Regions:
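A short glycine-rich, Lys/Arg-flanked "PGG" loop and its adjoining helix->strand segment in the class I
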Residues: 99-116
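Short alpha-helix
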Residues: 157-183
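Conserved class I S-adenosyl-L-methionine
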Residues: 119-143
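Hydrophobic, well-ordered beta-alpha structural blocks that scaffold small-molecule cofactor pockets
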Residues: 508-664
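Conserved alpha-helix/loop element of class I SAM-dependent methyltransferases that forms part
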Residues: 2-24, 533-538
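ATP-binding glycine-rich loop module of kinase domains
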Residues: 260-305, 326, 333-337
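Catalytic activation segment of kinase domains across protein kinase-like and atypical kinase folds
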Residues: 138, 143, 397-468
Length: 664
């Protein structure tokens, strides 16, 4: 599938999981959004007879037209008795707020007595907007959160729509005559749903490693929303701050019994599945497309294979085109190992060793002489550059495999079936045993250590406490992953790219997912007044004439600074707190202790800090007497020295402020 074809399929995960009555009538009330075509197709693919009407059409239908008569101009359709009605952008684009209530009252008369209305909408109180995303209608930060109070009456009339909160939507529905409704909180976005949670269900898993946030304006984001999910859950804010909603409305007290729905439409039609946790204690997995029906048979076969190899799996059975499993009330393996590391490091290591042993025995091992070493790195065959392709040493890993005992131990076992998803994210701890699920795929001839590396990465992802308790490097050394880590990441990256179509969707993700360095830059601006920020981060070369320049830091930031500016500014020295670097050099410049600043005349030098976490360094050099301090941001373009690039005088400001926060 092409990128555009996949992107068109992404929103379908919102409703394709639902058990619609096939052969019944559905009405799609359309606004002017980008979901319309995809959601209309979803209803048709679910076996419904779908009719469409524009929002203003429905609003203009007279009462007698809704008594069952056929009306000219509407394709001879009968304007009553719909089993299902769906509205998406029409919710946000109807005249606020009375206009939406009026529209919903009219929609109510079109439903059968046991019919269902579905609303799809964003949430003005979404966590994404607290993290710096722009409102989709005003194009500015925080307008929805403030309920559009800073938007003038004139501008409000020109807006294409507005967002509502969960409380507002609840009130609107009840005023419109829909007393029964169930909200499903959608993450990360209604245009690209990954997971939906019913409002009466509290998730009990590490969502920070499952959800990939996305935004209307990723360049203005200053906070990583996934770090807030756990606190939102603990404080009863999770559903109130969901990024979007699917709302199921009924005239009777009957709604779906689904509690959580996970969808994977980004994987393409053959691999897209949904997993539904239902209230009766069961979990149902089913394909989202007819092309994926064979996946369930493979899932069942993989379960049997792994159980034969000593891996305990959640028991499941194939029932009417679905894979049905019991709901397991156990602690997620991510939470288990994170807690265990914090409480008892020795016991953590013992149990992590058990996990490694389980991975090693999850499949037969392939003899080294049976491995196709010329294609062992899956990235080799993806290289499009002909010159680079010729430079690939295809015998590299064969030399390791048939080298010394130490080399072979470093590379490790190659599994006949490498279940690369045999990871903490897909497992529970039940009565002291590890129980796994969702083993849909395996990779042939996979290094076992690639699976272990994924587990370590998931354990440390987004939780800085883990690094303090037990540095990640120690686990890499314990399982001898460091010397051949390149080949493990090659297999992991290849697998994930193919599974999630990351390469195909690269431009889409670039437009909607945040850049961590930009987030860092945006956030640091918020700690200073405009004048302070200008002095510290923008005018870092100001008043440098006749002063010695020292760099604080000798890592990647310093290397980039030197590559760009050392020919224009004389660097007197580099200082660093790392004692092991004192007396060594970076790009020919000696690295010294920060104490070299003591005793210097503060007016004769300037320090430019070249490290990411600059706060401590800033305080340190200030305490050492420095008064001229700048902080280098590698994401910022600074003016070149006069005569090097510009013909005119410098203004003392940046050439271009690439990223911004606040109103556009």
């Amino acid at each position: 599938m092409t990128a555009q074809e996949i992107i068109k399929e992404l929103p379908k995960g919102l409703i394709k999981w639902y058990e619609f009555k096939k052969g019944t009538r559905a009405l799609y009330i359309m606004g002017h959004g980008n979901l319309e075509q995809s959601l209309k197709e979803s209803l048709m693919e679910c076996g419904l007879y779908v009719e469409c009407a524009a929002m203003d059409e429905v609003d203009g239908w007279a009462a007698d037209e809704m008594e069952g008569r056929t009306v000219d101009g509407f394709y001879d359709r009968t304007l009553s008795g719909y089993e299902y009605i769906l509205m998406s952008s029409a919710v946000e684009q109807a005249e606020p707020e009375a206009g939406l209530i009026k529209l919903l009252k009219k929609v109510r008369t079109l439903l059968k007595a046991d019919g269902k209305l579905f609303l799809v909408t964003e949430n003005r109180m979404a966590v994404r907007y607290f993290c710096g995303d722009k409102d989709p209608f005003t194009g500015r930060n925080f307008d929805g959160i403030e309920n559009y109070k800073r938007v003038s009456a004139f501008d409000k009339k020109r807006l294409a729509g507005r967002l509502y909160s969960k409380a507002e939507l609840t009130g609107i529905l009840e005023q419109a005559g829909f007393p029964y409704h169930r909200f499903y909180s959608v993450f990360p976005d209604i245009t690209s749903p990954q997971i939906l949670f019913a409002e009466d269900y509290t998730p009990d898993e590490e969502l920070d490693i499952r959800i990939f946030p996305q935004y209307h304006s990723p360049d203005t984001v200053f906070l990583e929303e996934e770090n807030l999910y756990t606190s939102m859950i603990q404080n009863g804010l999770f559903h109130k701050m969901a990024n979007g909603f699917l709302i199921e409305c009924s005239l009777e007290a009957i709604c779906s019994n689904a509690s959580q729905i996970t969808v994977s439409t980004e994987r393409g039609k053959e691999n897209a599945l949904c997993t539904i946790i239902v209230r009766d204690g069961m979990v149902i997995k089913k394909p989202l497309y007819a092309e994926g029906r064979r996946k369930l048979g493979k899932l069942w076969e993989n379960n049997c294979y792994l159980q034969r190899h000593g891996v305990r799996m959640i028991e499941g059975s194939l029932v009417d085109g679905t894979f049905v499993m019991p709901f397991v009330d156990g602690m997620s393996m991510v939470k288990h190992f994170r807690q265990l590391m914090a409480e008892n490091k020795n016991e953590f290591l013992r149990q992590f060793d058990c996990l490694w042993n389980l991975i090693l025995h999850s499949s037969e091992h392939v003899a080294y002489d049976a491995v196709d070493w010329d294609h062992f790195n899956p990235r080799w065959d993806e290289e499009k550059n002909e010159l680079k392709q010729k430079k690939i040493d295809r015998s590299r890993w064969k030399k390791v495999a048939f080298g010394s005992d130490e080399d072979r131990e470093a590379l490790g076992a190659v599994l006949e079936r490498g279940y690369i998803d045999l990871v903490l994210l897909n497992g529970f701890v039940v009565n002291g045993e590890y129980v796994f699920f969702d083993q849909e795929l395996y990779v042939e001839n996979l290094p076992a250590k690639a699976i272990m590396l994924r587990n370590i990465d998931l354990l440390y992802h987004g939780d800085t406490r883990m690094e303090v308790i037990l540095p990640r490097k120690e686990l890499l050394e314990r399982y001898k992953l460091d010397s051949c880590i390149e080949i493990y990441y090659a297999h992991i990256g290849h697998f994930l790219n193919k599974l999630r179509n990351d390469d195909i969707l690269y431009s889409y993700h670039l437009a909607h997912r945040r850049n961590h360095e930009i987030v860092h830059s945006n956030r640091q601006r918020m700690n200073y007044s405009a004048q302070e920020y200008q002095r510290l981060f923008v005018d870092i070369f100001k008043n440098l004439d006749n002063k010695k320049l020292y760099l604080f830091g000798s890592g990647n930031f310093a290397r980039k600074f030197l590559a760009l500016y050392r020919d224009e500014y004389e660097i007197a020295g580099v200082i660093d707190n790392n004692e092991t670097k004192w007396g060594t050099a970076i790009e020919g410049i000696e690295i010294a202790a920060p104490s070299v600043l003591e005793g210097l005349d503060a007016g004769t030098y300037k320090v430019i800090i070249c490290i990411k976490n600059y706060v401590g360094a800033f305080r340190q050099v200030r305490d050492l007497g420095a008064i001229n301090i700048g902080i280098y941001d590698p994401n910022t373009e600074y003016p070149r020295r006069q005569g090097k690039v510009f013909n005119g005088p410098l203004s003392g400001t940046q050439v271009k402020k690439k990223y911004h926060i606040g109103y556009a």
